[in-house]
Amino acid sequence: MSIDFDWSKLDSELEAKVLHLLEGQVSNLSLPSYIKHLKVVDFHFGKVSPQITIQEIGDPDPQFYENEAFELANQELEGDQCSRNNVSPVLTDLPPYAAEHPFSRLAYFNPAFNSPGILSASGLTSPIPESRPSTPMDNHQERDRSNDFQVTAHVSYDGDANLSLEAVLSMNYPNSEFAVLPFKLSFIRISIDAIAVLAKMGKRTHLCFVDTLLHGTGEHASSVIRDLTVESIIGESNKQLLKNVAKVEKFVSEKVKRIIEDELVWPSYITIE
C-alpha cells in the first residue's frame, strides 16, 4: 500500500532538532590534520517527498521492548543511593543510555540481528530465540502496550534535502597552520532506497532503516544511502575561489554517510518523544 503525505509539515522545529543531532555527531569526528573546525551550519528537508510503500503493520520488534526495559532499570540505578559495588551485576552491565544524545537510542545487543521481526521484513532471516531473555522490567509493572504498533515500509527518496558544513583547510608546512582557507561543503541531493521501520510505543516513536546490502559494494558500503551529490567551495568570497575539491569532498561525504548509518541503521535508531 502506497501513501502520500504533506512533506511541508516537517517544520523548522524538527529541522532544528536534526541539525542539533548532526552538530553533536560532527563535533566528535576525528579529522585529518588539514581539516579543522568542522561544523554543521544548516539543514533543510527540501520540497521533494519520498515514495513510501507500506509492507507490514504489526507489533513492535521485541528488541525495542528489551531496550525500553534496560533504560528503565538504568534510570532506577541512577536514582539509587547505594554504592555501585552493592548493585546487582545484571544492572552494572547496563548500557549508558544517560550519556547519549536525547534524540538517539542505540541498541546494545549482540549479535546485532538476533531479532527476527525487523529482519524478516527486509527478506533476511535469523534464528528465533527459544525463549525471551529475562529483563529488569520483569519485576516491574509494565505499561499498557495495547496501542503499540510498528510499520515496516519501503522508502525510496531522490530529493533535495540539503545539509551545509563549514571548516578551515590548514596548510601545516613549514609550520602548523602556516596558511588557512575557509571551506564550505553542501550536500544538495541525497538518494535513499531502503526498508524503514517506525515503531510507536506509548509516547515514543522509534525510527530506523534496515541495511540489506542490496546496493552496497565494498567493505564500507551501505544499501541505505545510494548517492550523495556534493558541492564545495574553498576560499573567501571576495578572492579567488576553488570549487569542487574532490579529496575534501570525498572525506567529508564518507564521514556524513557514516554518521547517518551509525544513527539510523538497525540496530541503531532514533527516538522522538
UniProtKB/Swiss-Prot annotation:
Kindly list the places in or outside the cell where this protein is found, as annotated in its UniProt entry. Mitochondrion outer membrane; Endoplasmic reticulum membrane
Main location as per UniProt: mitochondrion
Q: Which UniProt keywords apply?
A: Endoplasmic reticulum, Lipid transport, Lipid-binding, Membrane, Mitochondrion, Mitochondrion outer membrane, Transport
Indicate whether Transport appears among the record's keywords.
Answer: yes
**One MF term in the entry's GO annotations:** lipid binding
Q: Which GO terms describe its cellular component?
A: endoplasmic reticulum membrane; ERMES complex
Q: Which GO terms describe its biological process?
A: intermembrane phospholipid transfer; mitochondrial genome maintenance; mitochondrial membrane organization; mitochondrion-endoplasmic reticulum membrane tethering; phospholipid transport; protein insertion into mitochondrial outer membrane
Note the topology in the membrane: Peripheral membrane protein
Q: Where is the SMP-LTD domain?
A: 1-273
Using the UniProt annotation, give all residue ranges assigned to the region (Disordered): 124-145
Q: Which InterPro entries match?
A: Mdm12 (IPR027532), SMP_LBD (IPR031468)
The highest taxon in the source lineage is Eukaryota
Family, similarity comment? Belongs to the MDM12 family.
**Self-association state and partner proteins as the record states:** Component of the ER-mitochondria encounter structure (ERMES) or MDM complex, composed of mmm1, mdm10, mdm12 and mdm34. A mmm1 homodimer associates with one molecule of mdm12 on each side in a pairwise head-to-tail manner, and the SMP-LTD domains of mmm1 and mdm12 generate a continuous hydrophobic tunnel for phospholipid trafficking.
Q: What does the comment on domains in this protein's record state?
A: The SMP-LTD domain is a barrel-like domain that can bind various types of glycerophospholipids in its interior and mediate their transfer between two adjacent bilayers.
Q: In UniProt terms, what function does this protein have?
A: Component of the ERMES/MDM complex, which serves as a molecular tether to connect the endoplasmic reticulum (ER) and mitochondria. Components of this complex are involved in the control of mitochondrial shape and protein biogenesis, and function in nonvesicular lipid trafficking between the ER and mitochondria. Mdm12 is required for the interaction of the ER-resident membrane protein mmm1 and the outer mitochondrial membrane-resident beta-barrel protein mdm10.
State the name under which the record lists this protein.
Mitochondrial distribution and morphology protein 12
Q: In the record, what lineage is assigned to the organism producing the protein?
A: Eukaryota, Fungi, Dikarya, Ascomycota, Taphrinomycotina
The gene name reads mdm12
